[in-house]
Amino acid sequence: MILAGYGLLAACTQLLWLTFAPITTQAHRAMGVSAGAVGDLAGIFPLMYVILALPSGRWLDARFGRALSAGAILTGAGGLLRLAGPASYGWVLAGQFVVAAGQPLVLNSITKIAARYFPAQERTAAISIGSVALFTGVLAAVLSGAPLLDAGGLRLLLTAQAALTVVAAVWVVVSVRTPATFHGDPAVAVSLGWLRGDRFMWLLAGLLFVGMGVFNAVATWLQTILGHFGRGGAAGYLIAIMTAAGIAGAAVLPQAVARLDRRRAMLQAAVAVTVVAFLAIAALHNAAFIGCVLFVEGFVLLAALPVVLDWSELHAGPERAAAAAGFLLLAGNLGGVVLVLIVQGLIGNPYLSLGALSAAALAGVALAARLPARTAGAALQRSP
């Protein structure tokens, strides 16, 4: 029950984050602000995550029920606050800040829920479900924004999202009261100090910096990049294809690689495919070809998120799972900010923009090569 409610809430955080991304032109006219100001409604989320990720993770490890409930309440309250003035930029911005404050408490819970409520052999699947929920929320935001806006304006769009979010928030607040089925070792100190010298966690963080950074940069700049080749109009569909492929990959790959103990090999494949994918797009600009490339890219790249989170929970243990997830997602969000800005600086030349994405992935190849080849030898294999 709690995983279903959590999955819905996690999806809603992405839905609220990206509310205005597919309707930027219409929204800036309705609110009477610039398109850049509308973009800031999504841009505040990764910045807030960088600030709040670590303290949120520590609170979740220390007081899980209270912390996740607070995240659910903030998410629901932010969704409702936007309804105070759907066409008022001030009200909408205030609501986005509230949602952004709750998002780290929700997303950092993904491995903690798996560790508290599922036996070891089912935790990989639970983490995969949570990750699939995130990507489903992204896809729902991209596909539903324009139809709801056309049907009833900003009020209908924000009302529909708020209603769904409140249902999810109430569901989580109620279900999180269920006592944990599996308890960690109370002797393990809940702190953040262990992260400083943990080489393995820093390698995983570097990979998420690259992976989430590449995805955010593609979602932000693909239309502009393809516009140089006369294919800008296809960008929305191509991003949807990449995200849908990521949902499929996140649903099937993590369990397979965990069962075969091939986590490093999968992560190496993900970054290697990324290097090749954007070089291929730079070489051939056919929309159908780009769609095929981004399908493969999304399938492996987005599936890397649950693989990394699953591996981090094995390494950190149930007692520190939320802090580990917070650290990794902080790195991912920071990567989103940095790579978006790097590509922005090169956006006048599409070949340089695509080359920057491949270069970032090449750094990921070097990081992945330094991970342990297998986890069983390090006592990190899931129980059968």
Features from the language model and the residues they span:
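Extracytoplasmic gate region of multi-pass secondary transporters
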Residues: 20-21, 200-250
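Conserved MFS/SLC helix-loop-helix module at the cytosolic interface between two early adjacent transmembrane helices
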Residues: 51-86
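Helix-to-loop junctions at the C-terminal end of transmembrane segments
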Residues: 52-64, 249-262
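Cytoplasmic helix-loop-helix junction between adjacent transmembrane helices
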Residues: 95-133
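Helix-loop-helix hairpin linking two adjacent transmembrane segments in secondary transporters
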Residues: 129-177
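Juxtamembrane intracellular "pre-TM" segments in multi-pass secondary transporters
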Residues: 177-204
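C-terminal transmembrane helical hairpin of 12-TM major facilitator-type secondary transporters
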Residues: 263-308
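A late C-terminal transmembrane helix in Major Facilitator Superfamily
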Residues: 313-349, 357
